[in-house]
Amino acid sequence: MKKILCCILSLFCFVQILYSQQKEYKAYLVATAHFDTQWNWDVRESIDDYLHRTMVQNFWLFERFPNYIFNFESAQKYAWMKEYYPHEYELVKKYIKAGRWNVVGSAWEATDPNIPSSESFFRNVLLGQEFYKKEFGVKSNDIYLPDCFGFGYTLPTIAAHCGLIGFSTQKLQWRKNPYFGEKEKMPFKIGLWQGLDGARIMAVLDAGGYGTSYYYDDISINRRILERAKLGPDNTAYSYYGVGDRGGSPTLPSVYSLEKSLKADGPLEIISAKAGQIYEDYYPFEKHPELPVYDGELLMDVHGVGCYTSQAAMKHFNRRNEHLADAAERASVVAETLGGLEYPSD
């Protein structure tokens, strides 16, 4: 009897060792529902249909899948929830507190990072973070731009000076040509992006498609994610999954696949992740020399880049308004200093 028990225990230990050895790769799975506030529809349709759908579909998934975490950006959309759907908004707050619904992106609205001035970008983040802190008692730690058309050299510097530590996108994979004569479309999959002043943030440059879905799959053996993990630091990948443009939620089969894969025995350790978890896991970055560093801009060569030259009038008036806003603020500070009107801080 003792021999039988010893054999069983030995076999169990062997299986455990084998299982742990298999987990040499890691994948952060980030559930999302990219939501263009206004594209081929107006704001009213966004509020009446897409915003409401985003809330109720995710509520349904939360109640059925205990490890599911949803990531959603833009303080503007949360402000609409509060105004138009107060009951559902209270549920969103409950799920945020429980760690199931995660606010990401830091900004009032996901913005083009090339045309606006640095001051505009700072204000966008300031407004978003103040709203998140006031309404939910939390702040985001990242720049979350899955669907923008290139990223300027100032972005890591702005992010770092806003107290943010990470950035993610899936757009660079759309590039047609290799990056600046290199073999790949981007400098790295996951690494550190250095800005003009030497400030660095962690950057995920290939997060997969935000519309990625799974159909009752074992994601721990997913070949595409595994290949990305092999190219990442510490055999690590970061992967969006969900839907795009009109909000909503990941599909039911996708979330089922996630739950199933968390305890599966494939070579990938699957993590149901908040968008910024990977940055926190690697912070402080100085302790991780395995992270490659890129110093420069990250531009697109296809898709929406034509709008930067074709919309000259829009660029002109945007910059004019930025200058007028700056002048108005400076004048307000002078007026208050000289004993005139009180500075309109609201």
Which ranges hold each PLM region?
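Bacterial Sec-dependent N-terminal signal peptides
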Residues: M1-Q22
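Catalytic-domain carbohydrate-binding cleft regions of carbohydrate-active enzymes
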Residues: Q21-D346
